[in-house]
Amino acid sequence: MTHCNNQLIDQLLTQAEQEGRCLIPPSTAIRKALLRRTGGTVVSPMPGLFARKTRWDELNRAQRHCEIIRALAIIHPDWTFCSFSAACLLGLEASWRHLNVVHVCSSTKPSARPGSHIQRHQIEPAGAIRRAGISVTPPIQTVTDCLLQTGFADGMPIADSAILKLGLAREQLMEAVEQRAT
C-alpha cells in the first residue's frame, strides 16, 4: 500500500471519528486496503464498516452501536431505526445485550437470520422523527416496542430513562404498553 493510501485512510478514519460514525470506504481499493488492516490497526464491526481499533476499544457497547447506526443511516437514508437501536440513539438506557444487532423498521415480514447484523421488525414507522438527521420511531413507540420485547429487568432501565430523559409521563407509558399488549 502506498504512503498516499495510508494517509488517505488515516484522514478518512479521522473524519469518521469526528462525525461519530464508522468509516464507509469510498472505493473498492480503500475497502480492500482497510480489510488488509483488520486484525491490526482497524476493526470491521459490520461488513463494509470500519473503525480505528484504538478508538473502538475505548467505546462502550452503546457508543459502538450508535457509531454503526450513523454509518448505516448514510448508506440507507430511507431506513427508520426502531426498538433498541432507536432507544440507543435517543439516549435511553438499553441493556447492551440487545445491541448485538441493528433494529430497523420493515414493511415486509420480520427477519433475523442467524449471524445477521440487521434485525427487521414489521413495524410501521408512523410519525418517525429525525434525531441528528437519522430517522427513528417516535419516543413513545420506541419505548413501548422495547418494553414489549424484553423482561422486567431489561425494561425497567428503558422506562426509567424515558421518564427522566424524554419527559414521558409514567401513566402515558403504561397506557401505551397496555394498548399495544392487547
Predicted regions and their residues:
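Short gly/ser-rich loop at a beta-strand->alpha-helix junction or flexible surface loop bordering the NTP-binding
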Residues: 1-182
